[in-house]
Amino acid sequence: MENLILEIISGKQVTKEEALKFFDFELEEIFFAATKIRRKYKGNKVKVCSIINAKSGQCSEDCRFCTQSTFNKTDVKVYSLTDTEKIKEFSTKALENVGCFGIVSSGNSLNDVEIEKLCEMFKNHKKVSHLGVSIGKISDETFLKLKEAGIKKMHHNLETSENFYPNICSTHNYQERVDTIKRAKKFGFEICSGGLFGMGESLKDRIDLAFTLKALDANSIPMNFLMHIKGTALEHLPALPPVEILKTIAVFRIILKTPDIMICGGREVNLRDLQSWIFQAGANGMMTGGYLTTIGRDITSDKQMIKDLGLEIEPNHTY
């Protein structure tokens, strides 16, 4: 066991079978490996990001975890694309405290008019290099428009393994999501893609997801943990124990090694007093200030936590 950890720190690529065994290790053992790898590739810098839910609700997809799906019976706010000047103002203000900012929309995709509005705003945004978009399925034509407008980063989660995906969504398939990522890479975008954990998937499913993301060469891996929202199909699932969450983060760092690992939705609810342990588990980034339809923790508290740990916030990370 100790030899395996030392080999991994030295650069050994783990197999799926070896990765699965890490869930049986003591927490301090897996922390040791994950922290060493994080420091090797990321130092003591922490990336902090935030998002805006620019278009909310009325999604035609049946993702069982999502508050914005019309197949789930939630009281989520419903509104069309937010005025782009308001998005611009909100993102500019947010970027005074965070290094990157994501514009997220509900639904399978945006229409041509919505894309044109966003692209016009991007062209006139002084901090466009700090922006990313998460707008669903995207055509090659739209990829080109976004690139010409200055966008460099594309977010598109795989959510889980290909094997488990039919359990959470039937209105589109896994390969469609993979293809969107591959086409984004073809157009030269940085890729932000990760998953949601605690939906009933197995440990093997989590490892399969990590290896898929590794094969896709994703630059940033957002890790989200299920929040049990009333009205969603998954609201009655048991919550993941905090230690299992931390081990999952560590296994992702051990498998993936070099990408940014960002801890996002569900951090506060699921980790509670163990939130600061995400960095020992190998994460080097976090989302702050709230999520799509749920409240997060304020940036001041998160910045203090990072400072107390002797870590530094990485300023102005562009794509």
Swiss-Prot record:
It is an enzyme of class 2 (transferase). PROSITE patterns: RADICAL_SAM. Pfam families: BATS (PF06968), Radical_SAM (PF04055). SUPFAM superfamilies: Radical SAM enzymes. It catalyses: (4R,5S)-dethiobiotin + (sulfur carrier)-SH + 2 reduced [2Fe-2S]-[ferredoxin] + 2 S-adenosyl-L-methionine = (sulfur carrier)-H + biotin + 2 5'-deoxyadenosine + 2 L-methionine + 2 oxidized [2Fe-2S]-[ferredoxin]. GO terms for molecular function: 2 iron, 2 sulfur cluster binding; 4 iron, 4 sulfur cluster binding; biotin synthase activity; iron ion binding. CDD domains: Radical_SAM. Keywords: 2Fe-2S, 4Fe-4S, Biotin biosynthesis, Iron, Iron-sulfur, Metal-binding, S-adenosyl-L-methionine, Transferase. Residues 41-267 form the Radical SAM core domain. [2Fe-2S] cluster binds at C192. Its cofactor is [4Fe-4S] cluster; [2Fe-2S] cluster. Pathway: Cofactor biosynthesis; biotin biosynthesis; biotin from 7,8-diaminononanoate: step 2/2. One of its GO terms (biological process) is biotin biosynthetic process. Binds 1 [4Fe-4S] cluster. The cluster is coordinated with 3 cysteines and an exchangeable S-adenosyl-L-methionine. Binds 1 [2Fe-2S] cluster. The cluster is coordinated with 3 cysteines and 1 arginine. InterPro entries: Aldolase_TIM, BATS_dom, Biotin_synth/BioAB, Biotin_synthase, Elp3/MiaA/NifB-like_rSAM, rSAM. Its EC number is 2.8.1.6. [4Fe-4S] cluster binds at C59, C63, C66. Catalyzes the conversion of dethiobiotin (DTB) to biotin by the insertion of a sulfur atom into dethiobiotin via a radical-based mechanism. Belongs to the radical SAM superfamily. Biotin synthase family. Homodimer. This is Biotin synthase. The lineage of its organism: Bacteria, Pseudomonadati, Elusimicrobiota, Endomicrobiia, Endomicrobiales.
